[in-house]
Amino acid sequence: MASYASEVKKELTSIEVHPEHAKAELAAFLRMNAVLSRHDGQMSLDIVTENPAIARRIFSLIKTAYGFDPQLIVTRKMKLKKNHQYLVRVAQMVSEIMADLEIYSPKKGFITGVPDKIKYSEQRSMSYLRGGFLASGSVNNPETSRYHLEIYCTYANHSQDLQEIMNKYFDLNAKVTARRSGSIVYLKEAEKIGDFLHVVGAVNAMLAFEDLRIMRDMRNSVNRLVNCDTANLRKTAGAAAKQVEDIELIDKKQGLEPLPEKLASLARFRLQHPELSLKELAEQVPDGPISKSGVNHRLKKLHEIAENLR
C-alpha cells in the first residue's frame, strides 16, 4: 500500500504547467537532487530516483522547458534486486540550462539559494515549492501520526529562502531547523499543511488530508469526553464509598435512630443507593427534592459524627 506522501507526490507529478513554471519546478529539482558528471568527455546533469512517477515528471519538465528528450536509464538495485532506480540524464545544453535556471554562473559559481526571479514571483514560487517537495519533501499521514511536513535542504540559505517564500506569499508559518549535514524547512500545524498542499497543486490530497484531520480531531474529542466522564464516575464512586463507610460506622456504634430525622433519612437512602451522584441524591432523597448544597451539608454532618465516633 502506497504511503500518504507517495500519493501526494503522485498527484503532483500529473499537473500540467506552462514552460516558465516548468523551469521554476525544474530549478528546484536540479538544485536539490542533480549531480554534475562527466561521461565520455561530456558534461551531464544526473538525477536519480526510485519513484517512476518522479522520473517521468523530470523527463517531462525538461522536454517542456527546453524542447528535447533527456536520457532515461533504468537499473535494478544490486542489494535488493527488486527495486528499480531511474536515472534521468541531461547530456545537452548543460551550461545553458544551469545558467538559465541560475544554478551556476561563471561569476558566482554554484548558486545555492532560490533565484530572485523565482523568489519575487508568487506563481513561480508555487512551482518551485512543488519541485522542492517532489525532490526531498515528506508529509506524515494525518490519520496515524503527528502533523508534520518537511523539505530537506543541503544548504542552510536554501532552506531559509524556502521559509521566506512560504511565509511571505502563503502565510504558512514555516520553521527551519538543522538536520544531518543540512537543514529542513517544516510545518507542524494541520491547517498550514493543508494550505501548503493546496499551494503546490495537490488539491485531492489536500481534501483527503482535511477529511482525515477532521475525523481524527473528532475521535480525539470523543476520547477526551469519555476520559472526563470516566474520571467523574471514579470521583463520584470514591466519594460515595467514603460516605457509606461513615454511615455504616455510625450505624454500628450508635445506630441511625438517634440522628435527626433528615440526617437519618439521607443516611438510609445513601446506604440503599451508593451508586447515585450528589445531584441524583438531591433529586431522589425521600424528604426531597432538595439542593445539592443541602445534601452536601447533611453528608458533612454525618462525616463529623463518624469522625467523633472513631
UniProtKB/Swiss-Prot annotation:
For whether the record's keyword set contains Nuclease, the answer is no
Molecular-function GO terms, alphabetical: DNA binding
Which UniProt keyword terms apply here?
A: Cell cycle, Cell division, DNA-binding
Q: Which GO BP annotation is one of this protein's?
A: regulation of sporulation
State the DNA-binding region(s). 277-310
Q: Which superkingdom, per the lineage? A: Bacteria
- As given in the record, the signal peptide range reads none
Q: What InterPro entries does the record tag this protein with?
A: Homing_endonucl, Sporu_reg_WhiA_N_dom, Sporulation_regulator_WhiA, Sporulation_regulator_WhiA_C, WhiA_LAGLIDADG_dom
Q: Which family does it belong to?
A: Belongs to the WhiA family.
| Matching PANTHER family | CELL DIVISION PROTEIN WHIA-RELATED
Q: What does this protein do, in the record's words? A: Involved in cell division and chromosome segregation.
- What is the protein named? Probable cell division protein WhiA
Organism field: Lactobacillus delbrueckii subsp. bulgaricus (strain ATCC 11842 / DSM 20081 / BCRC 10696 / JCM 1002 / NBRC 13953 / NCIMB 11778 / NCTC 12712 / WDCM 00102 / Lb 14)
Q: What is the organism lineage in this UniProt record?
A: Bacteria, Bacillati, Bacillota, Bacilli, Lactobacillales
